[in-house]
């Protein structure tokens, strides 16, 4: 209760270990002053619900408090237990905020992501195909950092335990009609691991019949399915708003298929793709790139996909869409296996 006067007493807060959204700011600021650490209070709002307009100021925009440490360009979110001294929460990125220093001087500035490489998904996938090509065994190691780690740890934190049916399905390859999970191991899932951006690690093993099919006597391997379902963008209507993603992020896949001896691949060149978005300053700010090679019955595929900007120009929507859809197109890729 923000009207409870006891919660404005610093001694009471430390003794009872109880505070509210406002008094916890008092705790932090007094500790920073004692330690002679420079700080500012930043007040903003969720960008998905309200755009903070610094030119047409409205007090209703002052909805969420952050503590900004200017010397290190990091934020503390005192009312969100999943955040530590790190980047600002993703739903505040790109919004403006009112920054207030200890002398009560203020200014307006955009909340910026300091580390563009903060959020990554790394997947190592090993697929073993038996001689009869029926049941594929897939071993996968995943690592999530940044906002991906924070988001997925929240799912675990809000679940009954770290091994619910929902989590096991969520953290294994999506889009497989036939999937049996043989092993599921999750590490670093406590929210304390968000400190220093330590990766959330998930190791799984599953079997599926969904990767190989026969079509007109040909053996078809659904290579793309191992990356899981991907987003699509369509342009049926004229775009009105600028393009804004959840947060800058990166994906890396290291995929290996162990093919039974005696088989060759007819169309490996189909697995090489590249789509990119080049900003006006000449930098590549979004890209999907895949490459593949086949040697000694091992098909190796490497994929990198990244989005380094939070916002993209709406008049270049088609270029942005091509990058997004490249991953969806890869998911649908099939190659033909034929005997030597």
Predicted feature descriptions by range:
Residues 1-340:
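A sensor for short, sequence-defined functional sites
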